[in-house]
Amino acid sequence: MKTLPLTLVVVTIVCLDLGYTLTCLNCPEMFCGKFQICRNGEKICFKKLHQRRPFSLRYIRGCAATCPGTKPRDMVECCSTDRCNR
C-alpha cells in the first residue's frame, strides 16, 4: 500500500520537464573528452577548425547562442544535441 504513493512520486518526477540543459564538448584537441554545461540561452554546440599554417589545425569547441561566424581558413560546424560537436 505504501509503494503506490512512492511510485506515483517517482513517475511524476521522471515525467516532469525539470529543465533541459545542453552539454557540449569543450577542449582544443582533436579527440575530446571534456564537456561543459551550456548557460541559459546557449542552444548551440559548435566546432571550429582553424588552419594556422599548412598541416596545423586548431580546434575550438563549446556552447553558443548562435552559430559562430567564419574567417578565411576556418571551418565551423554547429548542432543542437548533447555532445554533438565531436
UniProtKB/Swiss-Prot annotation:
InterPro entries with a match to the protein in the record: Snake_3FTx (IPR003571), Snake_toxin-like_sf (IPR045860), Snake_toxin_con_site (IPR018354), Toxin_cobra-type (IPR054131)
Bridged cysteine pairs (disulfide): 24-45, 27-32, 38-63, 67-78, 79-84
PROSITE patterns associated with the record: SNAKE_TOXIN (PS00272)
Recorded superkingdom: Eukaryota
Signal peptide: 1-21
Cellular compartments per GO CC: extracellular region
Chief location bin: secreted
Keywords: Acetylcholine receptor inhibiting toxin, Disulfide bond, Ion channel impairing toxin, Neurotoxin, Postsynaptic neurotoxin, Secreted, Signal, Toxin
Cross-referenced CDD domains: TFP_snake_toxin
Pfam families: Toxin_cobra-type
Record Gene3D superfamilies: CD59
Gene Ontology MF annotations: acetylcholine receptor inhibitor activity; ion channel regulator activity; toxin activity
Known role: Binds with low affinity to muscular (alpha-1-beta-1-delta-epsilon/CHRNA1-CHRNB1-CHRND-CHRNE) and very low affinity to neuronal (alpha-7/CHRNA7) nicotinic acetylcholine receptor (nAChR).
Name listed for the protein in its UniProt record: Probable weak neurotoxin NNAM2I
